[in-house]
């Protein structure tokens, strides 16, 4: 007994292990790398394409020699955007084996200015702006050293490092104030170290030792019974995180501040949280999940569901000694709405893995790149940093190194591993004509990973190779550029199987794909 069926899928998804699918409604993947989802604008579809890499913006050629702005013995630990009197400025924190440094970088002119030298080596970096209008202050800390930097001119002149004589980094008990997690809340600078959370005098981010019980603007500190891991302003209060729990510190007219009861959601480290959309997302290593604080109707918060169940396999690879290397970033640009988690899970130390939550489509994908330490938005553009400063989504390579892409589809078995499936017609892909669509497809049949898989190179027969490099120009009145809505159809190999795992991948330079639909026509299902 047999039957014939067919389907066409317009909707690709990300990594799904909890509710995976290979059906007409959606095709998900068990794993992927350097691919992204996009709206095809056809039939409410979501397509699949290889993602772009990055380029170094801290190097340039001079007399056929490659020159780097960053000294050869230093690595970039932190990237910061500070706005000084309306002017956006780029700050880099670097470390060598012996010292840390702060630089102001002007990308347009390949200029780098040393701001602070001989800082302690900690491998950490945090910073924030204290905006006052008449004097905007950028405050930096690496956990040991705290520096205040500002500009007194709207012109693009060198920044000024505040004199230590004007800074009172001792608290009301004469203890030194230092630590991480710098944030601004209630017009004060907040900073934590261990179980102590300090706050500056209101309106004065440089003073921590002014105390007067009759003055509500006084500086002070709050001591907790557990170590603090992160802090973040949320809903008119300050969210204070521990490893496995959190509390809200709220304003109080009588006592200045008061604490709510503990919530079960904790945060792994001071950069493992980010505000995106209307929610505060944070990675809890004790639960190996990404949770969020969500605002409910009455204005209170509630703990959201774990959105990272499908990538728990990757999160289990995070070593407890590397927790402080996690970086979370809200990425909202012209064509992106994502939450990035830079996680120390790569088995190869020369590479890094970014787990990306596609906020619009509610899907996870993975990005593999050269080793980086930080990610940041500067002037509405996405940057990363390691040995150099990189601008993302600008190239087919990662600073001239090719790193392959793949999309390993969820296994197709039509709800049964015991029936034989025969493709009477080759499966077909509709691909975007603006891409090269030169890639490989791999078939693994019946879960047999010991047998060599069937691999075939796919080459689209579009006209892109003819007129791609003419995009944006008109050489005569008859010239018409091939629009992105033009599609081409490529055929995949036919196959006979009980269960089939399909993988699309690239393995050499100038390979890429952009898939709109996958169609399987006349699939015969036979009882055996």
Where are these regions (language model features)?
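Short beta-strand motif characteristic of blades in beta-propeller domains
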Residues: 91-94, 138-140, 188-193, 237-242, ...
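Surface-exposed loop/turn positions within WD40 beta-propeller blades
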Residues: 96-99, 143-144, 153, 194-195, ...
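Carboxylate/His-rich catalytic cores and anion/metal-binding grooves
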Residues: 177, 181-207
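Surface-exposed loop and turn segments in beta-propeller and other repeat-based domains
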Residues: 119-120, 163-173, 211-223, 304-323
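Surface-exposed extracellular loop regions of Gram-negative outer-membrane beta-barrel proteins
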Residues: 100, 238-263
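Beta-sheet repeat architectures centered on beta-propellers
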Residues: 1-134, 264-279, 284-528
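Asp-box/WD-like beta-propeller blade repeats and closely related beta-sheet repeat scaffolds
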Residues: 152-181
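Beta-propeller and closely related beta-sheet repeat lectin domains
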Residues: 77, 128-130, 180, 187, ...
């Amino acid at each position: 007994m047999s039957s014939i069926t067919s389907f066409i899928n317009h909707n690709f998804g990300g990594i799904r292990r909890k509710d995976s699918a290979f059906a007409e409604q959606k095709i998900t993947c068990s794993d992927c790398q350097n691919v992204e989802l996009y709206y095809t604008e056809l039939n409410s579809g979501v397509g699949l394409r290889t993602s772009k890499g990055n380029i170094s913006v801290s190097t340039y050629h001079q007399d056929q020699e490659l020159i780097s702005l960053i000294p050869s013995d230093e690595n970039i630990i932190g990237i910061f955007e500070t706005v000084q009197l309306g002017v956006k400025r780029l700050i880099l924190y670097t470390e060598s084996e012996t010292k840390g440094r702060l630089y102001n970088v002007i990308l347009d002119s390949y200029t780098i200015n040393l701001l602070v030298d001989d800082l302690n080596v900690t491998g950490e970096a945090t910073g924030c702006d204290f905006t006052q209008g008449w004097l905007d202050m950028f405050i930096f800390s690496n956990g040991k050293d705290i520096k205040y930097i500002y500009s007194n001119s709207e012109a693009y002149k060198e920044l000024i490092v505040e004199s230590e004589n004007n800074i009172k980094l001792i608290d009301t008990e004469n203890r030194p104030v230092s630590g991480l997690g710098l944030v601004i809340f209630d017009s004060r600078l907040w900073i934590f170290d261990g179980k102590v959370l300090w706050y500056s005098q209101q309106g004065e981010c440089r003073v921590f030792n002014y105390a007067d019980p009759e003055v509500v603007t006084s500086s002070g500190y709050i001591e907790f019974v557990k170590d603090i891991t992160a802090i973040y302003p949320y809903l008119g209060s300050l969210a204070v995180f521990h490893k496995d729990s959190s509390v809200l510190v709220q304003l109080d007219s009588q006592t200045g501040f008061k604490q709510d009861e503990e919530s079960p959601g904790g945060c792994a480290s001071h950069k493992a949280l980010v505000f995106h959309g209307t929610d505060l997302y944070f990675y809890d290593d004790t639960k190996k999940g990404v949770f969020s604080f969500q605002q409910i109707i009455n204005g209170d918060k509630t703990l959201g569901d774990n959105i990272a169940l499908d990538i728990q396999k990757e999160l289990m690879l995070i070593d407890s000694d590397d927790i402080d290397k996690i970086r979370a970033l809200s990425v909202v640009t012209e064509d992106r709405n994502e939450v990035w988690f830079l996680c120390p899970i790569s088995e190869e130390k020369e590479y890094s893995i970014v787990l990306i939550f596609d906020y619009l489509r509610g899907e996870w994908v993975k990005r593999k790149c050269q080793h980086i330490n930080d990610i940041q938005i500067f002037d509405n553009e996405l940057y990363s940093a390691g040995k150099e400063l990189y601008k993302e989504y600008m190239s087919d390579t990662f600073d001239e190194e090719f790193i392959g892409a793949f999309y390993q589809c969820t296994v197709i078995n039509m709800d049964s591993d015991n029936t034989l499936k025969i493709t009477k017609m080759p499966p077909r892909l509709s691909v975007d004509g603006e891409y090269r669509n030169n890639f490989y497809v791999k078939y693994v049949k019946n879960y047999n990973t010991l047998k060599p898989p069937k691999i075939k190179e796919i080459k689209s027969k579009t006209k892109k190779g003819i007129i791609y490099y003419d995009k944006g120009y008109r050489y005569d009145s008859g010239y018409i550029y091939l629009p992105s809505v033009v599609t081409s159809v490529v055929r995949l190999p036919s196959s006979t199987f009980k269960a089939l795992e399909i993988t699309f991948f690239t393995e050499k330079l100038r390979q890429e794909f952009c898939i709109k639909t996958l169609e399987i026509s006349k699939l015969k299902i036979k009882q055996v």
